[in-house]
Amino acid sequence: ADIILNAELVPGIGGGICQVSTTLYNAALLSDLEIVSRVNHSLPISYVPLGRDATVSYGAIDLKIRNNTDRHVLLKARVDKDTVTFKVFGDLPRDMAIGIETQVLETIEPGVIEQVDAKSPPGSRTTVQTGASGYLVAVWRVVKSGGVEIRRELISRDRYKPQPSIVKAGPSPQAVVIP
């Protein structure tokens, strides 16, 4: 699977492991566990909403969760072909509901990188890579009891870098002087 390296998706060892950390992160959020350490990806990913991802990188970036409750908690993981599932067992009050809300605070437009290619026809322009917007996102955990909101906790403010468009351009056409 692909990994993000220098703001680009490239094949690499460990690609896909972030789907496991992301699934665990969401299970922990929805179980009202404390997120001690978590880093979002540098680019938006497609398999969860913005702000709901958790990247890991061996020896550098880790997801750390703490049971900050006075209850026992059991985490159970299951992998079945291409599906990973985490179940969290514990004692939440019956009428308690936990939800996650995300809000895009800012959309960051991508720039354009123009690469002059002497082998291309003069004046030509070819898009090599289509750009993608970046985002600033806020994530809240919302806890309700009996349908009434009792706590709203800002979990994170995440920034996702925009990816610029890359355009290959031929040299400027020569000016023609008419006498």
Q: Where are the language model's segments positioned?
A:
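Well-ordered beta-sheet/strand-loop patches within structured domains
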Residues: 1-179
